Amino acid sequence: MSSQIALPDGRTLSYAQAGADAGPVVTVLDGPCSRGLGWALAPTARELGIRLLIPDRPGIHGSAAKPGRTMADWPADQLALLDALDIERTGVVTQSGGTGYGVAVAASAPQRLTALALLGGLAPMTSREARMDAGKQLRTAVFLARKAPFVLKAGLRQTFKKLPDSAIAQVPAADRPFLDDPLIRDIHLRTMREFLGNPDAAIEEIRVLARPWGIAPPPAGVIPTALWTGELDEAHPPAHARQVAELLGGDPPVTVVPGVGTFGLSRVFPDVLRFAVGR
């Protein structure tokens, strides 16, 4: 279920809430067009008494589009949401394409964050090293979003028409066993429908990933920060998490979870959420 607020510039921002009804707050920033990480974290958050705030970036769900936006624009939107909901401080948990947005908030308003937890960290895709280390699907999408968005849009539409089979077929081998869990399967299919069903927003999100972040990371040690990544993650492998840690001064610990890709990071959700709220 979505709610909305009006932003100072007149745009709307939509968001969902999950987890516990009361308690410390964690803001969840997932990859392009996705609330999936928030839904996946929700059962653990309820058990731990943690509220989850899941905001939608511009052009997604009920959030009004903002053409030409960059990651550096996001903190103002997130801070406006926190103010509207009378939330003084929040932990931040990101995944994949949400990495840079979380770093941007940490850099802009460190006093509003309890901690920054980065799952499946994605380094800036502006360097050749980052592009080559990324999975083939992500690397191709970034290239097409920059050079031939019409080709990418056609591909997204074709994949959407072939759901759910196309979504299952694209799941890496390390993650496929987790689809036996009805919750994970449902979240994955719902997320893919949202991503593929809104190709214009999806392409804009990928374009943002293809550009420089446009932010100066927070000084090392200002905000407690940690990274978790799956040993077998194909889209954003451990090399990306290490690049992000280096970008953040080299101090944040990188935990490589053995034998799993992205979905298998669910085993560390309790640790991630506790870290995010400073427990």
List PLM regions with ranges.
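Conserved alpha/beta-hydrolase "acid-adjacent" motif
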Residues: 234-240
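Conserved acidic catalytic loop of the alpha/beta-hydrolase fold
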Residues: 73-91
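Conserved HGGG/HGGXW glycine-rich cap/lid loop of the alpha/beta-hydrolase fold
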Residues: 11-62
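Catalytic active-site module of serine/aspartate enzymes centered on a nucleophile-bearing elbow/loop
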Residues: 248-279
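Conserved hydrolase catalytic core segment
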Residues: 89-132
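The feature captures the conserved acid-bearing segment of alpha/beta-hydrolase catalytic domains
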Residues: 212-222, 238
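Short beta-strand/loop motif that positions the catalytic acidic residue
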Residues: 221, 227-229
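Alpha/beta-hydrolase
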Residues: 136-140, 146-216
